[in-house]
Amino acid sequence: MSDSKDELIRMFFDEEAILFGRFILTSGKESNYYINVKKLSTKPRALKLIAKLMAGEAQKRGITFDRVAGPELGAVPIATALALETEKPLVIVRKKPKGHGTGSQLEGEVKAGDKVLLVEDVTTTGGSVLRAAEVLEREGAEIAAIMVVVDREEGAEETIGAKYTFLPLVRVSELFARRKEPQKE
């Protein structure tokens, strides 16, 4: 494990971004834990690290892309930081088309044939990020890969991986393995 990835995992605990209790997830599933990536993506140091890790992973895997996109709300700061890190234009995918103005479901420009690196904060089943991919593809974009900060390992990798390259920075099993390790003073 890289030092940077190790640092990101440590940040989840330092920032208390893993909560235990009873939670209903975006997927509709009930869970006894919640991964709150927003606690990290609202902290400049953590957000920079996430962007650096994502850019490095894309480069390591040979993933080329013209634009960075993320679905609202959780992925917007992540996509923004990655766009700044890579100097690629940003696209924000709305959950629903605007009811005013242009009525667009996208903020930012996508041209036919653009390769888009689509990012997400957390995946469970992958439904939210797949809906965003469909919106981008309707505009003519090609999804270069889907990258996520944390995969909960509840089916997203299989579902997304059936059609796209799926790259989680951290799997929930890696977070929980760290939780069980003795903490360094």
UniProtKB/Swiss-Prot annotation:
Organism lineage: Archaea, Methanobacteriati, Methanobacteriota, Thermococci, Thermococcales
Q: Where does 5-phospho-alpha-D-ribose 1-diphosphate bind?
A: R94, K95, K98, H100, E120, D121, V122, T123, T124, T125, G126, G127, S128
Q: Which domain of life is it from?
A: Archaea
The similarity comment for this entry is: Belongs to the purine/pyrimidine phosphoribosyltransferase family. PyrE subfamily.
Keyword annotations: Glycosyltransferase, Magnesium, Pyrimidine biosynthesis, Transferase
This chain is encoded by the gene named pyrE
Its BP terms in the Gene Ontology are:
'de novo' UMP biosynthetic process; pyrimidine nucleobase biosynthetic process; UMP biosynthetic process
Q: Name one Pfam family in it.
A: Pribosyltran
Q: List, alphabetically, the CDD domains matched.
A: PRTases_typeI (cd06223)
Record protein name field: Orotate phosphoribosyltransferase
Residues the record lists as binding orotate: T124, R152
Enzyme category, top tier: transferase
Obligatory cofactor(s): Mg(2+)
The UniProt entry, under NCBIfam families, shows: pyrE
Catalytic reaction annotation:
orotidine 5'-phosphate + diphosphate = orotate + 5-phospho-alpha-D-ribose 1-diphosphate
Documented EC number(s): 2.4.2.10
Q: Please list the GO terms describing molecular function.
A: magnesium ion binding; orotate phosphoribosyltransferase activity
